[in-house]
């Protein structure tokens, strides 16, 4: 199992001068960590910009710096190299790109201003657009993989369902924090153990990239409701999962505060 990735994810020095922020380096590190966590090999793409412009280049758009026959010829050769890798190894899980890049952008790219359009536009960069059949994911999206699973855990059926959801998420390369695996599965605990569990799960909530909350029943579990509220206050995305057909009211599936926070 492997991914193709923009080479600057592994070697940030390949980027244009002055554009790399600490937050970018953090995203790159998290991406590498996710791949290591799930045993995914990272195969770097060639860097058309570095090969054409050399190291230490200034930032620029495609139209400003790369819109030449020589660069087009280089991209044809590099496309053939990458296609040969895919033919030999099979399709990758995805390409991990870097948004805004003139060559490796995923959903945004600095193509250049023309015909009244701004220099930055939607779409893939000119190199990633050579591989339309391969799914592409921006590094900022790929780096978000830590999930906190908020759910009631008081019955065997609930714990079994929680485990199945965690397993499903794990097969899609998400690292799941499941409170019931931290010891929160029994009423036989003292005050110190309760404090430990609270602080442990609170810390996991703070570290998570997003929360999946199971909100079954006519009235959602109070602990799950607290976890959803805390996550929302931290500005973290909350995804509510519900298989129950019961509703709390005509306009609401569940309590409106939970529904609107997810």
Which residues does each PLM region occupy?
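Conserved catalytic or regulatory cores that recognize and/or transform ribose-phosphate-containing ligands
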Residues: 139-262
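Mid-chain, well-packed structural core segment of small domains
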Residues: 64-107, 219-243
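Short Gly/Thr/Asp-enriched flexible loops that form oxyanion-binding sites at enzyme active sites
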Residues: 104-131, 223-232
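Divalent-metal-activated hydrolytic enzyme cores
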Residues: 53-89, 117-144
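Extreme N-terminal starter segment of soluble prokaryotic enzymes
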Residues: 1-3, 145-146
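Short connector loops at secondary-structure junctions
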Residues: 40-59, 141-143, 177-185
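Short catalytic helix/loop segments, enriched in acidic residues and glycine
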Residues: 21-39, 124, 165-170
